[in-house]
Amino acid sequence: GALIGRHMDKVAEEAAAQVENAKVEEVTDANGLKAVKVTFDSGILFATNKADLNATSKNELAKFSTVLKNNADCHIDIYGHTDSTGNDGINIPLSNSRAKSVADYLKSCGVSNSQFQQITGKGSSEPVADNGTASGRQQNRRVEIYMYASQAMIDAANAGTLK
């Protein structure tokens, strides 16, 4: 666990250095290991009710793709989120489309398809702020990318060969 923790510390530092318009945090994955969570504000990524990436977003994601390519031993999950405006019939497909747009663009930048594990939308089910305010709704419209240890990284750590 300690080797993976140090490795993921480096991944977090690299992500923070490359990406200006996102929040980088260290979190714990399902295996109890350190992982990196990068949250992109959907206001930066998408126009309201749209899943098409704008030029600024593509620039940010292109920079971030370098981090993913440099850390090919990390698996990636991408989750799209919406605010509570509209119902699940609108928000779940929209959040799915946003997650897929981000994944497709990262793949077009050369990130390996094998790194992607989950690409899904959560609709408005996991708010991080109050949907009763404009600022809260803006915070809830986001895309989260999780980078975590692949089995290959865990095996390398156990074998003492993780760089």
Please provide the spans of the model-predicted regions.
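Periplasmic OmpA-like peptidoglycan-binding domain that tethers envelope proteins to the cell wall
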Residues: 81-156
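Solvent-exposed, acidic/flexible segments
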Residues: 8, 50-58, 92-95, 99
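Extracytoplasmic
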Residues: 10, 19-21, 31-35, 39-41, ...
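Periplasmic peptidoglycan-binding/anchoring modules of Gram-negative envelope and division proteins
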Residues: 45-79, 107, 145-147, 152-163
